Amino acid sequence: MSDQPTNIPTDNSPTLSPVEFRYARLILLTALISVGFGFTVLFAILGPLGREVGMSELQISSIIAASSLVVFLASPRWGRLSDRWGRKRVMVIGLFGYACGNFLFASVFHLTLIGALLPLAGYLLLMLTRVMHASVMSAIMPASSAYMADITSVATRTKGMGAVGAANNFGSILGPALGGLLAGITLLTPLWVASAVAIITALFVIFLLPDIPKVAPSTGQSRGTASQKLGYFDPRIFPYIIVGALMFMGMALVQQTLAFRFQDVLGLTAVETAQTFGIAMGCSAAASLVSQIGLMQRINLTPFQWLRVALPILAIAFACLALADTRNLMITAMVLQGAGMGLAGPAFMAGASLAVEPHEQGAVAGIAGSCGPLGFTVGPLLGGFFYQISPDLPYWFTFAIYLPLLVFVMRQRRGEKRLDQRIAAQDNSAT
């Protein structure tokens, strides 16, 4: 992937028996289903909920952007801490942080809705509580991805990351679907439920997820030194960082305007928007789940090969969203978007994971995992700004971004050759 020669990393991650591996994988993926539920509940209701308290599209987007910036800054730190403290401990911290932060966020929204807080005070407190929430919640995914990297081999890493994505997406199906139903009670009910689910998941992880022994660094390297040296511009992972940052920026730009798009194009009320958009998000997540289970778990391709399949699908989806003017067409476009992202997300994470040593998995999970929040820092602000100019501009802009990104991915060949060398080296050591 880089033009500089590098040593081929070895695969000295902890070995588990087949039974232990299946059990650890099952518990991790079950926990991630709950995490996916909690993460996606907010997207279905934030747009209409924000409008109910008098916030503009740009104010709503700025809350997501600020929290995403914090996740971007905190994720690498949590990833490195998972190398030192262990994956399970960091996951539990993140889950409890999510529950508490989400509860505070929902409480401020409640006070603003009933008039106990002025709109400006409510907006500032929502920003503060969401930033606090993000600073601790950002521990979950780096630790989870690193845990999966710990229990998979070089040859099965892409499938393992695909399974992580599939679990999240299954939760993402439940989140908007149940969130839309719960929003029929009150718009805040989904957030209260998400906090309770996070606490239950934390207890589930504490008592059932096996601890994985820490991976020793290669001879001559200390764990702390090796992990701290890994950065965004490391030539082994830099191409993946470019892909991830631009890919997620485009996704965020679209994601944060879709609820407004549904409400304005279809002429829906706030509750109807939450319910209809929740169904659309559920369909999108289902398509993502199908692409990960039906394709990634059955076909062996390199990460960049999967990206070459996924990016054109996403570009087509964004063009369709710009042109769609009916409910069915908008949902169809979101299904395409889900299918494409279901392939692109795990491929990006797996590629970055495979590029580094086993003892660097926590660090790389934090760095790669922060590309999404980086995209969601810039994307929502651009999306809100473009949407105020023209409702279809965010989708055409994202379409334009993905074309040069696809060209960049098509030109990446060295990383695939290096991955083939790693798999061959592992096969030789096994025999």
Segment roles from a protein language model:
Residues 96-119, 313-325:
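C-terminal ends and interior cores of transmembrane alpha-helices
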Residues 74-87, 290-303, 387:
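Helix-to-loop junctions at the C-terminal end of transmembrane segments
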Residues 44-59, 256-275:
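Short amphipathic helix-loop junctions that connect adjacent transmembrane helices
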Residues 33, 114-139, 245, 329-343:
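Hydrophobic core of transmembrane alpha-helices in multi-pass small-molecule transporters
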Residues 69-73, 276-299:
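Transmembrane alpha-helices of Major Facilitator/SLC transporters
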Residues 129-170:
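Cytoplasmic helix-loop-helix junction between adjacent transmembrane helices
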Residues 139-152, 343-357:
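Intracellular juxtamembrane helix-capping segments at the cytosolic ends
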Residues 2-22, 210-241, 426-431:
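Juxtamembrane intracellular "pre-TM" segments in multi-pass secondary transporters
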